[in-house]
Amino acid sequence: MILVIAEKPSVAQSIAKVLGATSRKDGYMEGGNYIVSWCFGHLVELADASSYDERYAKWRYDDLPIVPESWMFEVTKDKAQQFKVLSALMKDKRVTELVCATDAGREGELIFRLVYDKAGCTKPFKRLWISSLEDSAIREGFNHLRDGKEYDRLYEAALSRSKADWIVGINGTRLFTTLYHKKLVVGRVQTPTLAMLVERDGKISTFQKEKYFNVHVGKGDLTADLEKVKTKEEAKRIAAACEKKQAVVSSLKQETKTVNPPKLYDLTTLQREANRYYGFTAQQTLDLVQTLYEKKLLTYPRTDSQFITDDMEDTARQVISIVCRQLPLFSGVSITPDIARVTDNSKVTDHHAILPTVQLEKQDVSALPQSEQKILNLIGMRLLCATGEKHTYAETQISLSCEGYEFKTKGKTVVQNGWKAIEELFKASLKTKEKDDPMKSLPEVHEGNMLDGVSASVTEHFTTPPKQYTEDTLLSAMETAGNDQFDDDTEKKGLGTPATRAGIIEKLVKSGFAERKGKSLIPTKDGCNLVCVLPEQITSPAMTAEWENTLMEIERGNADADAFLSGIVRMTGDLVKAYPFLSDAEAQRFGTGKEEIGKCPRCGSPVYVGKGNFYCSNKECSFCLWEDNKFFSSKKKKLTKKIAKELLDKGWCRVTGLYTPKKPQLYDAVIRLDDSGGKYVSFKMEFDR
């Protein structure tokens, strides 16, 4: 029999249905010479540092750097049962070969290989590589299974990525956490992404706006401008000189321009536009397209390609027709698609651009959640736009000369709306006000025309600071590691991959280093402080992008994994050596985040409010006051923060309403600290005489 292992149960069910494996078992399905099971994502992961040595359970500076000589892997605790199922199936004598059917990408390969190796399996396996979960795509994929060894380099790159993240994350996080006494999470990709947020925030906070003035002259529907005049006095002088005077059309240029249709969506571009149009976070969009993929309504979403292959032309035409019939927004739209414009075999590696599938024909779109309908509309719109006609317009540039000053204006007239007609239809459905196009059509004039008695006016303006990143603009920056110099034909060296960028943004928010304000992503105080204390080799987007590029080269067989990891280890060791100690002032950069209520009577260190206690901040000191200690509990009292503060401040506190089983009434007493330095703090009572 053949054992097929998918990444998750829903995908396994789709595959099992096609293969005829319809008999349900505990953790798998069986039938038609196939056993189909699944992984629940990562079942096996790199072991924690404490698995290598018990002393690593405590975070100590002196243990750094931690670099395993031989890597260990462990089964994820809450997924142990499914690993047992897979391990048993791999050892089943009926099974002669396997099919890796996890997601067709770097992480999917890693998920399968780690389970395969951890289970000690040596049976041959083939690779299912598909871009859709439609029945026809699954059948086609099983008819063209590939030798699993063809993907050894992909696995090597995935494992190298995982090890590099472990080395940088474990050592960087422990190093700066022990130095600053606050958990500071450092990540190979997460930290440089945070650095971009901090850099932008710094530019905004230090920005000094400058005032400038524009002078406008015109008559009737024609107005031209002289921009960026430095002083109000000069602007007013120019306006006064031109008021009621004659202006001449000194130059008139007309040019026909075209705007090519946009490319199809890859994941990052889709996430950006879903954020711009709908306000979806990158993670929300990823979750939605993954759901639609599993519903067989979209092709594989974690792609970095914006093209399809030439053998998909007929399918693309069919899907365009289905989109116009099935998505109400585009009903009645009729286009003659130019499929050649979105076809380029050389720009499709693992997966083609994201498209709706022919399965959409059978779907009642109105029955889908609104969020899924929005994503389908967005992808449908892009498909129609990308294969539509060019947008053509005539641009007119006019210069007016008046009293020795040149005033300029631009206008345009649409010649052929082309693909923009579909985009406008989509934008109109959003019911949000679009910004007015600054270039409107101009009245007809000719060079040399005179305008008598023009009016002149002055407007005041200010230079504007850079804008905070949104998920749209941050994803764009991550694609190029903050380098804006890439053109469309340059291979980008970015931060992370399309599949991981959403998770990176979420980690920054969950760790408290960034926060969402409306659509903006803003670094927190801790986020800014973290970037300030970290060295450039950790915060540099360019360096991290080079690492990501090396991983791609490992995948292609052009770089050595051992050399890559050696460089990561060397950098980590240098990092630890560069931070042997901190001054007391620097160590308090992040503060404690804890409430101090007094000084320890044993060592003089601050005493903080804890969970159910008040404890000495000195780890070598055991002084602690418990809210529900036996002394106070026996008197039906709780040691409150107010009582603790007085005990630390004066050594005693007057407490009222104390209980004793010997008498029916409550009593008052002075309670004093009677601390002998032992494990528990003692108290004694004094009564008024």
Predicted regions and their residues:
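Conserved short loop/turn motifs at secondary-structure junctions
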Residues: 1, 101-104, 181-183, 254-263, ...
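Intrinsically disordered, low-complexity regulatory segments
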Residues: 1-162, 166, 454, 465
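Amphipathic alpha-helical transducer elements in NTP-driven molecular machines
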Residues: 9-16, 33-36, 40, 76-87, ...
